[in-house]
Structure formats: structure tokens, C-alpha cells
Amino acid sequence: MNADNPGPAATTVAAIAPALKAEILAEALPYIRKFHGKTIVVKYGGNAMTEEKLKHGFARDVILLKLVGMNPVVVHGGGPQIDEALKKVGKVGTFVQGMRVTDEETMEVVEWVLGGEVQQDIVMLINQYGGQAVGLTGKDGGLIRAKRLQMPDRENPGAFIDIGYVGDIEAINPAVVKALQDDAFIPVISPIGFSDDGQAYNINADVVAGKMAEILKAEKLVMMTNIPGVMDKKGNLLTDLSAREIEELFADGTISGGMLPKISSALDAAKSGVHSVHIIDGRIEHSLLLEILTEQAFGTMIRSH
């Protein structure tokens, strides 16, 4: 229950019985201690970015994590916003293996939407609720160095598909992120990388989040989606997946489309030492807090073994 979604009875924080308040705090306390001083990377996307109630709730949740001593780092997507902007200029987005085909005009739109409109909206909301957020792209402090992605052609082994200005991460320089964390700021990162000659590249936000979690030695990577987690072919939630099970789901086509880079990045992060990797339903209010601060099993956990 929360103040944003009142039922027939009063459900404001003030109306919650003292015993229940104490129970909520008691459940959260071990997790606050466990993650105090730790970096939590959050991939923020989907409905949580487009529905007003969820947007405001996310901003407050991130601030709370910071206030209790954690170091949240937000990596955001913006697919629906990019699609809408492309529609206005008469273009339709196309995808290959979950990656957006990005010609020169599309790249200009991506830069404007992600590095401008979407990022500024997130930063503004966090600051509006009393947090201190700073927006970054890959150019800031040399954060994300990228090169053109070579997309393997699955039907022609050894061949590659040209999908334009889509980036492959060459290196991440975490200095600017760590400096912001040390000064109590919340970094909000747009998934745009840059080559040494200044060419901008559109990078899948899941890929950036996974690599950022690895480089920052994050305790936890949480990916917010528009589904409950990873689903089997019958629509059942898979709550726990090992590397072997993920490979089987890739092979039989259960994981496809936009889930391919998401699950690949989650698995890579787990293999690289990120202690906890979860894919959760961002359509649920305060799902981020439920995942981090409660015992409730939520979404899909990705394991490296």
C-alpha cells in the first residue's frame, strides 16, 4: 500500500499502523546494512519511464537508496521516446537481434532524445524530490569509448550485418562516476558512446548497464522491464536461471528479440563478479525497493554457474 494508490480505506503512510511500520523497517534493516556503501546499478526503462506515477515513484525510490547509504547508478533507455521522435520525422524504427538499426539521421534523433529529453526528465524528477542527480553521456570524462558494432549474421557464419551507428563498448572510464558518488550525487547515464574521433554511437542500454556494473564492481544489477521477468514458452515466470539454462533458452528461441541483449548482458555481469543480477517488473510501483530491501522473491535472478 502507498499514498499514490489509495484504496477504499486510508492508505497514506500516516495511516499505517505503528506495528506494521515497525515490521517494514525491521525487514529492510538487514538489507540496508548489507548494501551500505555498495554500488547498485539500475537499468531504468519501459513503462516505469513513461507512466507518470511510476516515474515519480522511481525518483523517490532512488533517493531513498542514496539516503540509507547505498550508491545507486542509473542507466536509462528510451526506446518508446525514440520511436515517437522518429515517427515525427517520418521514420520507422527497425531492429536486428534486439538492436536498433541506426543510420545517421536516427543517430541524431537518439542523441537528442536520450542525452537531452529523457535524461533531463530523470535528473529533474530526482532533484525535484530532494536528491542530487547529474546526467552523463559517454563523452563526459571519457566515460564510454565505443567502436562500430559488428553484428554476426546468424544465417551466414563468418559474415556480419551492417546496422549503422550502433556501438560496441571498447572501454569504460569510471572516474567521473566515482567522483560523483563520492560527492553524494546520483549519476544518470545515457547509453551513448563515442569513438576517439568523436563519432557518437547508439549503445543498447542493457549492455551499458551490465558493463557499468562490472567496471564499478557493483554489488547488484537490477534491470527494470515491462514483464514479470524471464518467461518460458507457456508464459510462466522463471525465477532463477543458470548460465546453462540461459544457453538452452537462447537455443530453443524462448529468449529472443529485445530480451537477447538484456539476458546476455545480465549473464556477462554475473560472470564478471557482480554478486546479484535481477530482472524485475518495472510496472509494479516501488519494485526497485521491493527487490533490494525485502525478502520477497521478485522477478528472475541470473546466476553465472
From Swiss-Prot:
CDD domains reported in the protein's UniProt record: AAK_NAGK-C (cd04250)
EC numbers for this chain: 2.7.2.8
GO process annotations (BP): arginine biosynthetic process via ornithine; L-arginine biosynthetic process
Alphabetized GO MF terms: acetylglutamate kinase activity; ATP binding
Principal place of residence: cytoplasm
Reactions catalysed, as given in the entry: N-acetyl-L-glutamate + ATP = N-acetyl-L-glutamyl 5-phosphate + ADP
One GO location term (cellular component): cytoplasm
Locations listed in the record: Cytoplasm
Site keyed Transition state stabilizer: positions: 43, 262
Pathway assignment: Amino-acid biosynthesis; L-arginine biosynthesis; N(2)-acetyl-L-ornithine from L-glutamate: step 2/4
Gene3D superfamilies reported in the protein's UniProt record: Acetylglutamate kinase-like
Class in the EC hierarchy, top level: transferase
Positions that bind substrate: 78-79, 100, 202
Family annotation (InterPro entries): AceGlu_kinase-like_sf (IPR036393), AcgluKinase_fam (IPR004662), ArgB (IPR037528), Asp/Glu/Uridylate_kinase (IPR001048), NAGK-C (IPR041727)
Key words of the record: Amino-acid biosynthesis, Arginine biosynthesis, ATP-binding, Cytoplasm, Kinase, Nucleotide-binding, Transferase
Function according to Swiss-Prot or TrEMBL: Catalyzes the ATP-dependent phosphorylation of N-acetyl-L-glutamate.
NCBIfam families registered for this protein in UniProt: argB (TIGR00761)
Family indicated by similarity: Belongs to the acetylglutamate kinase family. ArgB subfamily.
Protein known as: Acetylglutamate kinase
